[in-house]
Amino acid sequence: MPVIRNPAAEKSTKDERTASCTVRSRKRKADVAIFLQDPDDTLDCLEMTKKKQYQDRGQLSNEMTCKSPHKLIPTPEKEEHEPNPTSYPHFASLRFSPVSASPLPRLGWANQDDVWRNMLNKDRIYLRDKNFFEKHPQLQPNMRAILLDWLMEVCEVYKLHRETFYLAQDFFDRFMATQKNVIKSRLQLIGITSLFIAAKMEEIYPPKLHQFAFITDCACTEDEITSMELIIMKDLDWCLSPMTMVSWFNVFLQVAYIRELQHFLRPQFPQEVYIQIVQLLDLCVLDICCLDYPYGVLAASALYHFSCPELMEKVSGFKLTELQGCIKWLVPFAMAIKDGGKSKLKFFKGVDIEDVHNIQTHTGCLELMEKVHINRAVLEEQNRASPIPSGVLTPPQSDKKQKSDPAD
């Protein structure tokens, strides 16, 4: 007997099979997603889920027990623990208060106090150590200066931004502080890999991997750079967003020249002024002792040498007495910069004229370091010869004071 087909029943069965396959497919994809998920993210999600369930259960309990809506008092969220402030060897007296007044103007896109607090916290979290060369007996501090000077040259060749260079400098210094017994032949690999990471984070169109390997004259292969990239990021605990020296300086100079608050994110300062002051940062960063001071302090002290104390205090939030140590340390560098004359703005093909000041340039800072050492020796000799520090005025002796006119 022929079997009578029921189209309606077949359609229902087909829909059920399709739905079942869809469920299995979705479940399979979910399993893959769970497998690929970061274990730390999974733990965070579990903690968030437990917290949410606890809060929901508490809210439900309140709704059941409280008869009046006004008795439902929401529990304030717990504030995240702020990192403990880190003391610098020569800057231990400075402490930033979370409620200190922010020098930033009122912002339309964020609370200026929150932005300022976040900037200060980054200077606490990202730690540097100028004594990390003690862990590497085969290395000398001048090797760091040579490497950073070469990275500046690489940045100019590939038209990379200043922020990219200063990110690479921060990655290099913090990574070296986590290592021991690094040999000289590995130093260039660590430096170019730090720049490779920074370029991928900061540049819109970063150079390709083979370009970074090529610029080392094949001393570093592509495989070595990618392997070192993972090592650096792991040892830095994936903390790759510091507030660099040039970031602080950009903020201070922008506050000094701000005219229209709605355009706060657009540079409003003269490029020529920017170039003169940022050259001081390019020079002092070659000295390992710059790691004694927070980046914000270095930027404010550099601004002091090219402006007045009142302006520096207004735009940075620091007091002059708080920066005296860093200001004094920068004197030989500022003397070398001013003796060399004004820097000229460089123009690059394919770079917008409004952005040329942000391109890292190579201005021969390594040669200027020789003048810095000479200036430092001269200043130390003057301080030994005179018991009075330079720049300090003393009142005249009593017998040499001018006598006032009785008629007055």
Curated annotation (Swiss-Prot):
Organism in which the protein naturally occurs = Xenopus laevis (African clawed frog)
> What is the gene name?
cyce3
Positions carrying Phosphothreonine: T394
Family per UniProt?
Answer: Belongs to the cyclin family. Cyclin E subfamily.
Q: Name one GO molecular function term.
A: cyclin-dependent protein serine/threonine kinase regulator activity
Q: What biological processes does GO assign it?
A: cell division; G1/S transition of mitotic cell cycle; positive regulation of G1/S transition of mitotic cell cycle
Which modifications occur after translation, per UniProt?
Phosphorylation by CDK2 triggers its release from CDK2 and degradation via the ubiquitin proteasome pathway.
Check the record and name the SMART domains matching this protein: CYCLIN, Cyclin_C
Query: By what name is this protein known?
Result: G1/S-specific cyclin-E3
State its location(s): Nucleus
Q: Which InterPro entries match?
A: Cyclin (IPR039361), Cyclin-like_dom (IPR013763), Cyclin-like_sf (IPR036915), Cyclin_C-dom (IPR004367), Cyclin_N (IPR006671), Cyclins_cyclin-box (IPR048258)
Query: Quick one: where is this thing mainly located?
Result: nucleus
Sequence ranges of Basic and acidic residues compositional bias: 398-408
